[in-house]
Regions:
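N-proximal low-complexity "stem/linker" segments adjacent to membrane-targeting elements
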Residues: 1-17, 26
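Conserved N-terminal catalytic core of the sugar/cofactor nucleotidyltransferase
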Residues: 2-6, 28, 32-108, 119, ...
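A generic "binding-loop/recognition-motif" signal
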Residues: 11, 22, 57, 81, ...
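Active-site metal-binding loops of divalent metal-dependent hydrolases
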Residues: 11, 109-111
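Conserved beta-strand segments of alpha/beta enzyme cores
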Residues: 25, 74-76, 235-237
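Conserved beta-strand termini and adjacent loop/short-helix elements that scaffold enzyme active sites
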Residues: 55, 78-80, 133, 239-242
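Catalytic-core segments of class I nucleotidyltransferases/pyrophosphorylases
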Residues: 103-105, 112, 118-125, 137-138, ...
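A short, conserved acidic/glycine-rich loop-to-beta-strand motif
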Residues: 127-136, 141
Length: 266
């Protein structure tokens, strides 16, 4: 049974004043809530087990799901009403709700996209522990991958901060950033290593066998921190979609273009 987690617990501060009275998951685009759009789209690809985490105006989401007969059979709630746990902590808290034998598709509720989820499911084979959907687009923070698309680290191109469990990535003798070609060239002694820069989409596939590694993490943490601290001992890969189209509907101005985006994308 295909399963997914929809991150819907955020405060939605960039969508105020709408989110002063409702969770962002229930904000409508084209007359349909963001939560409904996400569930319905994934359901078209055969997903029938959903976990939705809630925090901000959590009861509204709980009631919304309970009022839909199909949702009430497919959707389980991971309640973070007492404390917002961020993406990693939210996934960790929900671990018991998933089938251990099937990857978990993770999707932010405020993202619209053109992903073929049958194709993306095929990218997560048994040997991968996680697959992150990435693209080449301008951003301030990039994930770093080797030529086999295995995760090596992270870089903030504004501050120059490097994060990685690999010392040769974190502490190179020199580093040359080529943003135009999405490369980071590192020198360690006489060895030159080229890493590839990709922007994370917020969509990823997660193997439940990674859950035990989360036990040493606090209750609250971002999922990217988990990936960056464990990628040297796990098999975390990036998957590039060249024609990827995403719209973050987390800001008021993005609502104005969302309907047009849906017309040409979904």
């Amino acid at each position: 049974m295909k399963q997914a987690m929809i991150f819907a617990a955020g405060l939605g501060t960039r969508l105020r004043p709408l989110t002063d009275t409702m969770p962002k998951a229930l904000v409508k685009v084209g007359g349909v809530t963001l939560l409904d759009r996400t569930i319905q789209r994934l359901h078209q690809y055969g997903y029938s087990r959903f976990v939705v985490n809630v925090h901000h105006f959590s009861q509204q989401i709980i009631d919304h799901i309970a009022q839909n007969d199909l949702y009430s059979r497919m959707v389980q709630i991971s309640d973070e009403s007492d404390e917002l746990l961020e993406t990693g902590g939210g996934l960790k808290k929900a671990a018991r709700l998933f089938d251990e034998g099937e990857p978990v598709l993770i999707h932010n509720v405020d993202i619209l996209d053109n992903v073929d989820y049958d194709w993306f499911r095929r990218q997560h084979l048994d040997e991968e522990d996680a697959v992150l959907l990435v693209s080449r687009r301008p951003t301030k923070r990039y994930l770093l991958f080797d030529n086999a698309m295995r995760l090596m680290g992270w870089v903030n191109i504004e501050t120059g901060e490097l994060r990685s469990p690999y010392d040769w990535v974190k502490n190179p003798d020199s580093a040359v950033l080529d943003v135009e070609n999405y490369h980071l060239n590192l020198m360690r002694g006489t060895t030159e290593i080229e890493l590839n820069l990709f922007a994370f989409s917020g969509i990823h596939s997660f193997s439940p066998r990674l859950f035990p590694l989360m036990n040493r993490f606090p209750d609250r943490f971002p999922i990217i921190d988990f990936y960056l601290q464990t990628c040297h001992r796990t098999r975390i890969y990036g998957c590039q979609k060249d024609d990827l189209r995403l719209l973050d509907v987390g800001k008021l101005d993005s609502l104005e273009v969302a309907e047009k985006f849906l017309t040409f994308t979904i």
